[in-house]
Amino acid sequence: MSHIQVFDTTLRDGEQTPGVSFSFDERLTIAKQLEKWGVDVIEAGFPASSQGSFDSVKAISETLTKTAVVGLARCKKSDIDAVYEATKDAKYPQLHVFIASSPIHLEHKLKMTQEELLENITENVSYGKSLFDVVQFSPEDATRTDLDFLVKCVQTAVDAGASIINIPDTVGFSYPSEFGNIFKVLIENVKSDHEVTYSAHCHDDLGLAVANSMAAIENGATRIEGAVNGIGERAGNTALEEVALGLYVRRDHYGIETNLKLDETKATSDLVASFAGIRVPRNKAIVGQNAFSHESGIHQDGFLKHPETYEIMTPQLVGIKSSELPLGKLSGKHAFAEKLKQLGYDITAEKQVELFKQFKSIADKKKNVSDHDVHALVQGHSHETNAAYQVETLQLQFVSEGVQSAVVVLKDHEGKEYPSAAIGTGSIVAVYNAVDQIFKAPSELLNYQITSVTEGSDAQAQVNVEIRIDGKTYYGIGVDHDVLLASCKAYVEANSNHLADTARKDGVVS
């Protein structure tokens, strides 16, 4: 069978999902799980964009031993230098350099002629090649670029030393036959004295990212880019787990295999969903809760007689266990640590002590603590510790019909407490009014969403909030058994994110 490379951009393009911002530790943990899953290449970040991204890419480069690490760069020498410095200690460093090629980008964003663009490609790809053995070039918005000019751009990049050409459907504009034809034309017309790998990077604006990626494979692409669970800006990226299982289940048609360990797929999906704070839709292909459920009586009858009547793959193939051994109030530190390890978390001993205390609190309230509860526990702890303040106490009191009084005490990382009291038409409004008095930043609540982490009346609640301050949007996530406490935690994190943003602008936080 032929082999195709899997290029994961969860930590770069995936993190551009509105409301998603991975911490340093979360990025490192995800990178380790991606390597365990078996991806060939990880796009660890955009080093020139921020010190945080640079540090994360550097740490990932120094940690991974089997997976190539890529840094993204614009066609600018300073960007390329930043990638070099961040990835120079990687075992397999790669550079991904890009510049837009479509008429609308040339005219309105870059203010360049086609000739100037080709000169820019030559200059920066050749500079990148002087620092890296492997250079990938992407003509941004390739699918809205005239095909003849796209061939010129790619030929120019190949002549300058690029050995990987990535074709991005940046705005999810293309459809399978058109996208596949782009690869066919490029492979037939671009000449090279060295081997060139063609890669596909699709967005899901029209719901065609996976279909377009498969069409690219059918027309010669040997590298596919995407993100776990298909996360990414706007409608998201190609869902890598869907491509992987599509190739495996229909290997009779494609004749192509990946290096992915398919039984690590569900664990990888759950880990990313937990850190991103985005629940996987129940009907999501491959990893959704309903992916292996059968509701129809006819389907159930057939499935019970022979599973293959209505299942083209087994839950075990993607790592879904037929039975789960839940933790309980009698579970000790060792069992809890082992569960964290099973779920893909690489957590310091100090943090494990903190998490174990919270776990015991949950176990006292629930008969069984499921894997989803543990994911929620880690996620909630991560969001709380990343916030500038933590919720110390929360008290509510009925004042009169429709009016509640809330007393909130927040604590900063140095242990200083900030009390506040307020009233409001309802408990949530009262709590948020009290928090507003502490942060002193008038905000507008744009979205408030509450979901149950698990089934049952004893389930933990996850609250996602979206607020606007000074015209900018901030997000927060809170997890707790108590809905009001989860709501308060989410609102505090969103306001903390605004505080951190303001500090960065003032030069306080790098």
From Swiss-Prot:
Residues 390-510 are annotated as: Regulatory domain. The keyword Membrane does not apply. CDD domains: DRE_TIM_IPMS. One of its GO terms (biological process) is L-leucine biosynthetic process. It catalyses: 3-methyl-2-oxobutanoate + acetyl-CoA + H2O = (2S)-2-isopropylmalate + CoA + H(+). Mn(2+) binds at D13, H201, H203, N237. GO terms for cellular component: cytoplasm. Pathway: Amino-acid biosynthesis; L-leucine biosynthesis; L-leucine from 3-methyl-2-oxobutanoate: step 1/4. PANTHER family: 2-ISOPROPYLMALATE SYNTHASE 1, CHLOROPLASTIC-RELATED, HOMOCITRATE SYNTHASE-RELATED. Homodimer. NCBIfam families: leuA_bact, PRK00915.1-3, PRK00915.1-5. This is 2-isopropylmalate synthase. It comes from Staphylococcus carnosus (strain TM300). The lineage of its organism: Bacteria, Bacillati, Bacillota, Bacilli, Bacillales. The gene is leuA.
